[in-house]
Amino acid sequence: MFELISAINPEDVSTYDNNLFVTIDIDWAHDTILSNTIDILEKKDIKVTWFVTHDTPLLKRLRNNSNFELGIHPNFNFLLQGDFKYGGTDSEVIDHFLKIVPGAKSVRSHSLTQSSRLSSLFSLKGLTHESNMFIPEYSKMDVKPFKHVSGMTICPYIWGDYLDFSLSCNKSNFKETVLLSGLKIFNFPPIHIYLNTDSIEMFEST
């Protein structure tokens, strides 16, 4: 029932239609917070795709769990603001994060930064699956993965906890959401798991 992003094949409905995909944007979480999330998901014994933002000794623990796969979570925001913290070009930024996760197959950019050029660069660097598109479950669309002209498999996600508790309306009925047909990718940053965030006000006051 739970599967990894890299297992999605747009030409084979059975690889996604009856599966749930849990993804974690690590988002530079402190090791205490990240370890808490790993503990919870290891106890659940489910498959999880982790989008990595930084090096930490905990990556070894993640790599040693066959239920987990590591993707990259490149941050292009600094580059867009003229700051070369992670590299002076989009290609260098991707390389920076691939040095942390060599051989990564999946990618989701911080802030969902995306373009046809980036998709082509991802593909050229050996990445295969991109989850930079958000189509909320309340849109009632039958979400499906698809092949981009670059060769990347585009895997939209339908639910993110921060997005959900930020909404004043269209709150998700989670029990109904997991029963939807089509592609069901969920996004959980560790900080919100650690805090058990239930509102934007709670998060901002922490």
State where each predicted segment sits.
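Terminal accessory/targeting
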Residues: 1-67, 77, 95, 99-103, ...
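Substrate-binding cleft of extracellular glycoside hydrolase catalytic domains
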Residues: 65-93
